[in-house]
Amino acid sequence: MAELLQGWKRTHYCAEPTVDEVGKEMVLMGWAGTWRNLGSLIFIGLRDRTGTMQVTFNESELPKEVFEKAETIRSEYVIAVKGVLARRDEKMVNRNMKTGELELIAKELKILGVSETPPFYIDDNVNAAEQLRLKYRYLDLRRPCMQANMLMRSKITRIAHEYFAEQGFIEIETPTLCKSTPEGARDYLVPSRVQPGKFYALPQSPQIFKQLLMLSGFDRYMQIARCYRDEDLRADRQPEFTQIDLEMSFVEQDDVMNVQEGFIKRLMKETLDVDIQLPLPRITWQEAMDRYGSDKPDTRFGLEFVNVSDIVKDCGFGAFADAVKGGGSVRCINVEGGVEHFTRKQIDAFGDLVKTYRAKGLAWLSMKPEGIQCSFAKFLTEDQIKAILERANAKTGDILFFVADAKDTVVYQALGALRLELGRRLGLMDDTKFNFLWVIEFPQFEWSEEDGRYYAMHHPFTSPMDEDLDLLDTDQGKVRAKAYDIVLNGNEIGGGSIRIHSPEVQEKMFEKLGFTKEEAWERFGFLMGAFKYGTPPHGGLAYGLDRLAMLITRASSIRDVIAFPKVQTASCLMSGCPNVVEQAQLEELHIETVADKE
């Protein structure tokens, strides 16, 4: 039966005692991890969130009832031990433990909670399937690596609170029951009981409210915000997620970015003791696409694109010439020394990879010692091949991979995916490197072939660049935005923009997105109405806290830095949500489900 504390107070966490405290009496509390019964000696690895301390029960030095109680301890029992800190014998020292030189010689024991045999071993090297670990998440979270992840996440939020408070930011909470303004991802809806037929939406971001706070005179806002998006899940996405959300008034783009760079520098120093050099590099969206095929490029390695469109535009190879004539491009990657690394079978596999990104195929040119081997050599002149090799700085031993298409988006996506695959296979993604950069000057709009209309690339409140305002009426697709993303090792960790603060420009923006004036006012009237009462220039940024924590902890999945995550069906395997609710609850909310009718 579980015992009560009855006045016992923990004096130390398990990994806190030091050699300077040898001989001191202390009380430790935690979970029994490893345990060994050697007859007259029992060794328990007592674990809490700080680490593990070996506790030794010596039969010859303990009352009979204490030792017999110790004999009943099994894995994951919750115990409290009163004892004296001692040095281990030299031959018993464990150099792999922070407390490996120490042990607690037990004098008294309380068993505070008993445990059934866990469904998997509570250890970092556990082989249990993730589904099982998520079902018993409260046990999975006891593993040292998971505890370390949660502690690091907590440290990140603490640093954010401290840094932005020092910079004059005010923490303000925004509503989680909001108006549905469908544009982009689907909303999670909450039915109103008191207003039948009406619904709240859970916020996809605090965007509108933080802009309204700027209108309200709070010139620097910060919040650790919970956000919700009803979208198909990927490895790095969850239906509910957390943002470090920020907004500033009376600023331009550089002002926002400079404040964020200070945060990044401090964050990396205090979490990983990594010194980040400022200012961070900046490249435009177009440059990022042209060089890396991605708006969140991994710059830890090269393998940059080489545009050879002008060289091959009139060549005899139809795949190349047609791509250029169709308004697209031909680009290649030069893999230095690639001849030694890749077999023909592997090259064929690369061809299959680019086809998954709608490329028609992969062309290649191999600079072997005995001469050039090329999948398209007979269609090009010697001068054209020579020009390609010179532009790509190719030499003997190198191999070039080409993708051509009449749509640059296909070339970017296909060759960009190949670049990342090559980086992985060649071991170029150094986990000890932290390459931050800003991507700026995004397109204001992106065209949807499926819907036949433009959408806002970021959101409809992003300000166009001043010099592009006239293009809104003449060439909408060429308008650039005052938008900026911060990227780390190929991952977008934050994004923001300078916002529109002119009512006229905001109305024009909605018009260009296909909203009638009535539709815009129906959805966003409370914001547009507020714009009439004096709006300061403002802008901001939001970091994805989950993704940031994943990268800093080097976790393999975003689920490993969230205490109770969902799986790809947006379900919680531990609690069983979402679940069917009682009919009475539905009736009270004036809801009838389609499944009921069927």
Residue ranges of predicted features:
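Class II aminoacyl-tRNA synthetase catalytic cores and aaRS-like
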Residues: M1-E598
